[in-house]
């Protein structure tokens, strides 16, 4: 078996993913040190570097699939080349194979966030945003004068194979993050949004300061699957207890939309795992006045 890093049309849900039907998906938020390009000659290609970051998926594939991919990608010619690379996930670093642009690949346009799915999103007219932290709550959104951008709420949504963390540190405590965990799920609120809402979110999440990065995830809401924009911490640290005002935003925003099971998880989170002073009383009061 071979570990394979894919970043373009071979990713789950894209045009060539069926060529990996017999593979095992190990990680959807894997990364390598490289620069991602798109060109007229092909959908996407990477050049290995020591500065950039490209995000994609890590698969485990059989030798027969690799033989087929070699033929398809023209690895023996000059279109794509098979290379060895170190892949980083939220839990480990490992060696893998990646197909990079060959020497004769024409110069393309570098993609700023190193994420093929993000560059192509949305492929249709509808754009969705999955909030799992403080953006489930509208208080700060109202104060910013952008409430109209978040009025179209699809409903509660669930992100499978991730867990909630507080790995971004600021002066008064931790801030919410998601991390891949095949035994867990994260619930939140799914909004239908427009580009001005995305601009607000990029600023609020500190994308340009390098705090969070945008990514595309698959969520379930009311029995339907959606591809949605969300944000995850780039430099994850150990979990840190969030402050009361932030924990309150999360619970208040989640309360009308998430399942009873997840509500109970949040209650346990803010009273036992990450005890936040005042949250036990606040959550009881919110329950009484619902």
Labelled PLM ranges:
Residues 1-290:
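Glycine-aromatic micro-motifs
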């Amino acid at each position: 078996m071979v570990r394979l890093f894919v970043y373009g049309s071979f990713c789950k849900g894209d045009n060539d993913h069926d060529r990996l039907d017999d593979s095992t998906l190990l990680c959807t938020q894997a990364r390598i040190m490289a620069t991602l390009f798109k060109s007229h000659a092909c959908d996407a290609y990477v050049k290995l570097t020591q500065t950039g970051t490209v995000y994609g998926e890590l698969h485990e594939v059989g030798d027969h699939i690799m033989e087929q991919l070699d033929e398809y990608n023209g690895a023996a010619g000059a279109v794509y080349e098979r290379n060895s690379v170190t892949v980083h996930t939220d839990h480990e670093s490992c060696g893998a194979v990646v197909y990079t642009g060959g020497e004769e690949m024409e110069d393309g346009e570098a993609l700023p966030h190193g994420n093929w799915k993000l560059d192509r999103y949305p492929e249709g007219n509808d754009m969705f945003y999955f909030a799992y932290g403080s953006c489930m709550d509208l208080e700060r959104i109202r104060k910013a004068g952008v409430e109209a951008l978040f009025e179209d709420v699809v409903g509660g949504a669930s992100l499978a194979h991730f867990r909630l963390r507080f790995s971004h540190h600021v002066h008064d405590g931790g801030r919410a993050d998601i991390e891949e965990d095949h035994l867990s799920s994260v619930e939140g609120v799914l909004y239908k949004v427009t580009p001005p809402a995305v601009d607000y979110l990029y600023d609020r999440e500190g994308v340009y300061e390098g705090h969070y990065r945008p990514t595309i995830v698959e969520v379930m809401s009311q029995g339907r699957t959606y591809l949605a924009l969300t944000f995850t911490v780039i430099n994850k640290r150990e979990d840190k207890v969030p402050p009361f005002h932030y924990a309150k935003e999360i619970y208040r925003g989640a309360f009308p939309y998430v399942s009873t099971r997840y509500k109970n998880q949040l209650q346990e989170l803010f009273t036992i795992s990450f005890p936040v002073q005042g949250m036990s009383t606040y959550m009881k009061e919110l329950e009484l006045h619902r």
